[in-house]
């Protein structure tokens, strides 16, 4: 694989990617068969031999100078707006994305180029109709990843709901985050997320898209971009998903690409958890029980048998502040333990209370909503 493409080859590769009725995989196979995109557009003898064998609607486009002219305009616009095209046949193309069934031939990147090989990419996705439980859970998942695997990069789609919560949580914890968009990088959808999107760029993250500048969002593009979210990531975590949530397509793409999928459980009565429960029931996703459990499943670091689930958590004993000592708390086994012990991890609360992890997480969620406890770094909880 060439370390880089010549400027001419870059232009003609973009031109080929613009050709209608030629999908990314077909375009890549065509380049590999002919040796270069440049030859397809400039070698008269090759064109005379190849074009008649292609469908007429494709051959007419390749015979016209229109595609190359448009490619030159796109390159000029990319340079003007700080957008970097990355090509499938270049060594700087993200290796995990190269392995999916239909990788983009050109990936457009805006912002700091994230070192894919040096970080652990995890996609955090879910419903747009996020519940209060989903908000708390998204923040907790990202917080656990930050504490347990500081080399994490959070990948999501900048959509309403779980996506934007995941990006914002990553930014608050100084984790790089990558937004995969369903349109050209000269604009932003939804526009309500401009502030967070710009902070992603300022804080060393990136926007990525398979669409060149000038392409507006359209329905099919949102499903297509989900394969890129999954393809960039070693694992996908589904926070909340209704029965027909678009985030389930991200999980499907991840599974098709041989990646691991983790689904977070919710209450049985919550419609926004039906999709997650089905993934777990059908054994298409691991039950998400925490970042350390996920890391072991991924082989990112096996803990010793006697080690705690959160090796990077804060000290297990932290005396509550004086205001907590004078506050009157309702009777609850978890509150009683926190009053006596101070800040504890979820695993410690489970061990000391005798409750299973799922019950502890559910109870902590209710207590957090009621203002009795607050989540801390490393998956720990303390009294408010």
Regions found by a protein language model. Give the residues of each.
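Short, small/acidic-rich helices and loops at N termini and domain boundaries
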Residues: 1-91, 370-372, 377-384
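Glycine-biased, small-residue-rich flexible motifs in mid-sequence functional cores and linkers
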Residues: 2-7, 87-384
